[in-house]
Amino acid sequence: MHTVIRSYSGSGATALFDILEERKEEVESLIRAVTGFVSYSLVRTTDGGVTVTVCQDKAGTDESLQLAREWIQANVANIDVSPPAVTEGSNILYLS
């Protein structure tokens, strides 16, 4: 399995997570369609938020990154959102 973590802070991050929360059903539908989807978390922080996507392989997490980028461009272009810090890697242990 492969995990990608996107950390949003700075300009527009809080507003972005307000919109993501308002439209969480749409976000869920989009992410569940990712090839090899395993799990997803949308986490609010004091200065924005974090998303954690787990897929069967790197191809799935790459697809999720592209879909997230496209969704943000299409739905929150009016907010000046700083690009996320992206961390990714292969899972050593996954519990559910």
Give a label for each model feature.
Residues 1-52, 56-70, 77-96:
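Short S/T/G/P-rich N-terminal loop/turn motif that feeds into the first structured element of a domain
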